[in-house]
């Protein structure tokens, strides 16, 4: 039984309000995650050349379960090694960079004002990716808020990855809204 007598398992009872009624909710906390160095490197090519660069998200959106996972980043060296496996064993010339929000890469959400991207960490990551010799790289997911929070970020990354009319790059955005009320209620760190 994985829940018996474990120090990382606990039940919190919290009071919150919904529709002017007090509700007592039970929340189960179970901390069972591997350390980053316990996650093995890939040894065979990944599908479509996709490599993971981070796990979790620090934005804390109320509708998303990814925010429940702790935020952790793979080093540029680990990412580079996995891309090299895809190149050598899979013949890939591109790298799909998987994350739940690429613009959170390298930041410490507990100290980062307004969740501004860590431009230095992102530039280091994409420089390492391109140093493998791939012709194209593309992040899988990101937020519009992260993309526009630093006006130099997108132009700098575009230069690093050689983006242009012959090398289009995009990012898939998840739930986004222009409503200030909804953002404040459900995603106040965007």
Predicted regions and their residues:
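Acidic, low-complexity intrinsically disordered segments
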Residues: 1-78
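Conserved SAM/AdoMet-binding glycine-rich loop
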Residues: 84-190
